[in-house]
Amino acid sequence: MAQRAVWLISHESGTPLGGIVKFSRRYPTVEKRAKVFNGASYVPVPEDGPFLKALLFELRLLDDEKDFLESRDSCSHINKTSIYGVPVGGEELWPVVAFLKNGMIYACVPLVEQTLSPRPPLISISGISQGFELLFGVQDFLSSGQKTDSELNTKLSQLSDLLLQTCPFGTLLDANLQNSLDSINSASVTHLQKQPAWKTGTYKGKPQVSISITEKVNSMQYDKQEIADTWQVVGVVTCKCDLEGSMPNVTISLSLPTNGSPLQDILVHPCVTSLDSAILTSSSIDAMDDSAFSGPYKFPLTPPLESFNLCYYTSQVPVPPILGFYQVKEEEVQLKITVNLKLHESVKNSFEFCEAHIPFYNRGPITHVEYKASFGQLEVFREKSLLVWIIGQKFPKSMEISLSGTITFGAKNHEKQPFDQICIGGTAYLKLHFRILDYTLTGCYVDQHSVQVFASGKPKISTYRKLISSDYYIWNSKAPAPVTYGSLLL
């Protein structure tokens, strides 16, 4: 007995779709079970927009839908059960439990633990009765004591946390949401008075919360048709909560912009007290699709005294921040190099620093360099056989820069010159080093106003972001190069 998804929809005539989704919750773990149980008859749960339109059509609540349709309006299709088959993308999502009450549509999709073709009797689907119980419980919670729109919005904002307690992983434990809310509130008060054994002391002083998001981007670029470039973002959220009391409670929310890249492979600190199942099931192993959970990512927690890493995550961003190619041509004791770098237009063009390190292994010291750089400066470290292209703090308006030159080497001295077992012959790389402050490649951020602190005093909340290059290599496209894959960049 479980639910695949739950919706609360406000029926509002005159809006573009005829209604507004006020709340929705999907259970990815239940959805995977549905895919196994239903087999070839499986129909995925659609996004909110398509589902809203299809459900309003089936309930005959669309403003512009007045025509008679045999499949929906004939006498043989009179609905007496509030259970519908909703047409979505040429298929039919069934069973959908839905009813309209006081301008609000309550809907859910129960799990059917067998094939849907032929349709099993309703009495054999235990998730349907559980779905009705859940929806009636939500209806009672929203209607109790509600007088104004602000009170309704407050209760809607509490639903997400309440369903974590009353319906974890889509399985209903308690349909009385008000009792659950009261128990959560009373528990938060009583627990503040008890010092946990793992917390060695309490903080005394001005309350403050500091949250820092650091993303590191890895990349391997080859400029070859037969080898795909790879890149990946690895992020960490670091927190320091200086709050009075033995058990202060904090809720931190990570948000993404509309075009942000969903966070995956999320690992959380043990101090996190509860978590939406959709956060834990988002994995980089699975193929990305439009249904990927894109936040907000809420972390209710009881913070320790010291600084701690709230969570780690990865993300599959669509493009690397800097694209480039590197070509090396050998002529006797000389090397001719060509480098081209381009900053992607979506990336913030403001660096704390940006450098390209170009090492030359298994050769003698650099004796002479002739070069032409369209931007920045070139520093030569002769004994280390290293060129450092200092790009600076900003790319030019064209977002593209280039470097070409000829390097002459002296006789080898195996004791002093850098040696590498991979970079032999033409195999060579350029490594980028950069840092961008107040920016993340995924777009992930913490809104100061979304941080909830349940402790004495009003804390000062500080948030920081930065993007740092990690293993960011551009290999010589004119020679063999070691190949890596996205899953190995971790």
Swiss-Prot record:
Q: Which domain of life is it from?
A: Eukaryota
Task: Relate the assembly described in the record.
Answer: Probably part of the adaptor protein complex 5 (AP-5) a tetramer composed of AP5B1, AP5M1, AP5S1 and AP5Z1.
Query: Pfam family example for this protein?
Result: Adap_comp_sub
The protein, known as: AP-5 complex subunit mu-1
Instruction: Note whether Cytoplasm occurs among the keywords.
Output: yes
Organism classification, top ranks? Answer: Eukaryota, Metazoa, Chordata, Craniata, Vertebrata
- What is the gene called? AP5M1
Q: How does it sit in the membrane?
A: Peripheral membrane protein
Sorted keywords for this record are: Cytoplasm, Endosome, Lysosome, Membrane, Protein transport, Transport
Q: Which InterPro entries match?
A: AP2_Mu_C_sf, AP5M1, MHD
Give the main location: cytoplasm
Gene Ontology CC annotations of this record: AP-type membrane coat adaptor complex; cytosol; late endosome; late endosome membrane; lysosomal membrane; lysosome; membrane
What sequence ranges are listed for the domain MHD?
Answer: 206-476
Q: What family classification does the UniProt entry report for this protein?
A: Belongs to the adaptor complexes medium subunit family.
One GO term of the biological process aspect: protein transport
